[in-house]
Regions:
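Non-transmembrane, aqueous-exposed alpha-helical and coiled segments at domain scale
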Residues: 1-248
Length: 248
């Protein structure tokens, strides 16, 4: 019923069901996603042949409107959360500002024209399998770099933006999803970078000198305890940066 109300075609239903099965796990913890006061929501990335079969968008305006499959799959999941799970604002949902992902946020990766492994392949699946990844995210936020033509420059821009995720003073206890556009991805592909090299180098660039983010430093009360001075910590958890290629 909720899928019909969202405008899904019958062939979208396997993806809707897979998305619901994914978030209804202890590992994902949908209750925590709703109950937090933070502005986050579930994001779904779909990989595999089904993305072509049902006409999902992985290209121009991939995170926006205009594609029935992308829009209605995400919306159907949110209607189930609200109508079946009781996850409405002011009830279970306690977000201070909310998140547009709670209207519906689903897209496919542009995996068929990239030399790099897809998100699903990086997670241990093969290209013939249909896979959905559920991720709790804020944003999205734009990373603008119109001048870098070499990967060594562009990756520094990306790292600089990623460090500010949630707050530049929050480290280790979070993940992030980086959606790399074709133009930016091409800088790395043409230079012969592998996905593994990209992730290794950007992770190294996001090692944080804790002395700069101790509570009270630079007149900011937010930060880490003084007992952690002298430490160097990663911005994200190990394997906590999810790299997706999409857009036009």
């Amino acid at each position: 019923i909720n899928a019909v109300m969202a405008g899904c075609r019958p062939e979208f239903l396997p993806v809707v069901i897979a998305a619901l099965e994914t978030i209804c796990t202890d590992e994902f913890n949908m209750h925590a996603v709703l109950a937090t006061t933070m502005s986050v929501g579930p994001i779904f990335v779909v990989n595999g042949p089904i993305t072509l079969d049902i006409g999902m968008n992985s290209g121009i305006n991939v995170l926006g409107h205009g594609n029935r499959a992308n829009s209605t799959i995400g919306r159907a999941v949110q209607l189930v959360i609200h109508n079946v799970g009781g996850g409405g604002p002011g009830g279970v949902d306690r977000s201070t500002l909310g998140h547009m992902g709670k209207q519906g946020f689903c897209f496919s990766e542009n995996e068929f024209s990239s030399p790099w492994p897809s998100l699903a392949e990086s997670r241990g699946y093969n290209s013939s399998q249909n896979v959905i990844t559920a991720f709790t995210g804020e944003g999205p936020r734009l990373v603008m770099d119109q001048k870098s033509r070499k990967p060594d420059s562009l990756i520094r821009t990306l790292a600089e933006h990623l460090i500010s995720t949630t707050s530049s003073r929050v480290v280790v206890g979070m993940d992030a999803m980086l959606v790399l556009s074709p133009e930016h991805a091409a800088r790395f592909h043409e230079a012969g970078w592998s996905k593994e090299r990209f992730l290794e180098e950007i992770t190294e660039m996001m090692m944080i000198d804790v002395d700069n983010i101790i509570a009270g430093s630079n007149g900011i009360e937010e930060g880490l305890p003084a007992a952690m001075k002298g430490m160097t910590l990663p911005k994200f958890r190990p394997d906590g940066l999810f790299l997706v290629q999409a857009g036009g």
